[in-house]
Amino acid sequence: NLYQFGNMIQCTIPKRLSWSSFVDYGCYCGKGGSGTPV
C-alpha cells in the first residue's frame, strides 16, 4: 500500500536523518517483513 511504498522510498535516503531508526524499519516494508532489507 501507499504507506509501505513510502517506507521503501525512505530506504534509499541516507541514514543521517533524525528518524533513521524508522527508516531501517521501513526497509522491511512494514510489520510483516515481506520486503527485502536494503
UniProtKB/Swiss-Prot annotation:
Protein location: Secreted
Domain of life: Eukaryota
EC number: 3.1.1.4
Entry keyword set: Calcium, Hydrolase, Lipid degradation, Lipid metabolism, Metal-binding, Neurotoxin, Presynaptic neurotoxin, Secreted, Toxin
Single GO BP term: phospholipid metabolic process
Cellular component terms (Gene Ontology): extracellular region
Cofactor note: Binds 1 Ca(2+) ion.
Top-level enzyme category: hydrolase
Gene Ontology terms for molecular function: calcium ion binding; phospholipase A2 activity; toxin activity
Protein name, entry field: Phospholipase A2 1
Organism of derivation: Calliophis bivirgatus (Blue Malaysian coral snake)
